[in-house]
């Protein structure tokens, strides 16, 4: 079965193909973000950027398992300079990996330094020009808005100039928890405030003829995050803007719930055609984020990077230990990227429900299983020979490759 359906040109109400929102292409190193390219997987290392060797090792670990863009934190000028050493060591000992630098409080000098060394700079509009909260303030006048807007432009312009001259990119990364005080006074702690915060910086960048931009609207609550991205996409469409969106639920936590929370937010938006690059943020080792990203993309048919297994949940009709057999089949075949393999417990629903699979393993009678190629039954074999005979069938079709040896 081919889960990556050929895109159709006309969306229908019940279309099974995801029609991505058209967005421009933005280059980050050798990776392109935008609707004409696969949805990109990102993560962020935990290491202190001053630890050159540790950071290089962490970036390499992520990249080797499929992380296409890696973010590092740069809280000081010293950290920003260290990124140059990290980039060089990666190039000398491994390969050039697309890097993003995270810049926050009063970050102009830091951003200007790190822009020399990375492929994209992420700034937070709520913190880039920090407004110290005033407990006595009742609101902002138009004159104050204009003054702060000029201050933002003056602070942003050197970075925009640097990135534009180097043909590098910027992410305008809004966080729900760090909106500027004037946005909170004007729009409240709302998706509208998040969107206006991003649009303010977008307009400034466009005034400076800089459009290598990616936008994110992250929040720790999935409903807030989804509302912000939907509104951002609508506002950009209304304004004729086509910037790619970086999706993520920030501070999602760990374990099953962290994964579910991220999948709900990211997967829902992707299913609506919104989103061009994703990060699943877990309070775990960053390496644990990557399989979740690829699983979301595969489940939606947006990227196929693993075997697609179809298996029933088991019931009283099941003629063998379904869970055990599925594990055996997976262990033997999970390196055959691109295949769809079904493991079904009985003949009642098995053939119909697995009809789109490339190969099927179905309980036929007690102690006997049937092997299928597509919809066609090929042979019946004793259960104990089932996995071996499945492999032989795949080999006979010329679709088998030997697994890579474990290092």
From Swiss-Prot:
[4Fe-4S] cluster binds at residues 312, 315, 346, 353. InterPro entries: Dihydropteroate_synth-like_sf, IspG_bac, IspG_bac-typ, NO2/SO3_Rdtase_4Fe4S_sf. Its EC number is 1.17.7.1. Binds 1 [4Fe-4S] cluster. It catalyses: (2E)-4-hydroxy-3-methylbut-2-enyl diphosphate + 2 oxidized [2Fe-2S]-[ferredoxin] + H2O = 2-C-methyl-D-erythritol 2,4-cyclic diphosphate + 2 reduced [2Fe-2S]-[ferredoxin] + H(+). One of its GO terms (molecular function) is 4 iron, 4 sulfur cluster binding. The keyword Chaperone does not apply. Its cofactor is [4Fe-4S] cluster. GO terms for biological process: isopentenyl diphosphate biosynthetic process, methylerythritol 4-phosphate pathway; terpenoid biosynthetic process. Keywords: 4Fe-4S, Iron, Iron-sulfur, Isoprene biosynthesis, Metal-binding, Oxidoreductase. Pfam families: GcpE (PF04551). It is an enzyme of class 1 (oxidoreductase). Converts 2C-methyl-D-erythritol 2,4-cyclodiphosphate (ME-2,4cPP) into 1-hydroxy-2-methyl-2-(E)-butenyl 4-diphosphate. Belongs to the IspG family. This is 4-hydroxy-3-methylbut-2-en-1-yl diphosphate synthase (ferredoxin).
């Amino acid at each position: 079965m081919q889960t990556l359906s050929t895109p159709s040109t006309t969306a229908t109400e019940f279309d099974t193909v995801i029609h991505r929102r058209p967005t421009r292409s933005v280059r980050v190193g050798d990776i392109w973000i935008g609707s004409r390219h696969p949805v990109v997987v990102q993560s962020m290392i935990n290491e202190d950027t001053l630890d050159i060797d540790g950071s290089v090792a962490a970036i390499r670990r992520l990249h080797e398992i499929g992380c296409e863009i890696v973010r590092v934190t740069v809280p000081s000028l010293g950290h920003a300079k260290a990124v140059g050493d990290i980039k060089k060591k990666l190039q000398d000992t491994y390969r050039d990996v697309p890097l993003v630098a995270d810049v926050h409080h009063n970050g102009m000098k830091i951003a200007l330094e790190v822009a020399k060394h990375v492929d994209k700079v992420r700034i937070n509009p709520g913190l880039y020009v920090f407004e110290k909260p005033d407990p006595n303030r009742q609101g902002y006048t138009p004159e104050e808005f204009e003054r702060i807007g000029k201050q933002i432009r003056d602070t942003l312009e050197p970075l925009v100039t640097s990135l534009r001259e180097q043909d590098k990119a910027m992410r305008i990364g809004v966080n729900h928890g760090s909106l500027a005080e004037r946005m909170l006074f004007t729009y409240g702690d709302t998706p509208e405030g998040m969107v206006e915060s991003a649009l303010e910086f977008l307009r400034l960048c466009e005034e400076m003829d800089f459009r290598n931009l990616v936008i994110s609207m992250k929040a720790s609550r999935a409903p807030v995050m989804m509302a912000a991205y939907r509104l951002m996409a609508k506002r950009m469409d209304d304004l004729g803007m086509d910037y790619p969106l970086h999706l993520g639920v920030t501070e999602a936590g760990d374990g099953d719930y962290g994964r579910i929370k991220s999948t709900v937010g990211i997967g829902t938006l992707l299913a609506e055609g919104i989103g061009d690059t994703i990060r699943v943020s877990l309070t775990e080792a960053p390496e644990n984020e990557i399989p979740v990203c690829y699983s979301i993309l595969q489940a939606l048919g947006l990227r196929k990077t693993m075997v697609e297994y179809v298996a029933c949940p088991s019931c009283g009709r099941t003629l063998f230990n379904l869970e055990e057999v599925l594990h055996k089949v997976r262990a033997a075949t999970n390196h055959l990227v691109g295949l769809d393999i079904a493991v079904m417990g009985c003949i009642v629903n098995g053939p119909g429900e697995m009809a789109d699979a490339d190969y099927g393993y179905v309980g036929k009678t007690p102690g006997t299983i049937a092997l299928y190629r597509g919809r066609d039954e090929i042979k019946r074999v004793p259960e104990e020979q089932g996995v071996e005979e499945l492999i032989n069938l795949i080999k006979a079709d010329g679709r088998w490759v030997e697994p890579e040896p474990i290092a």
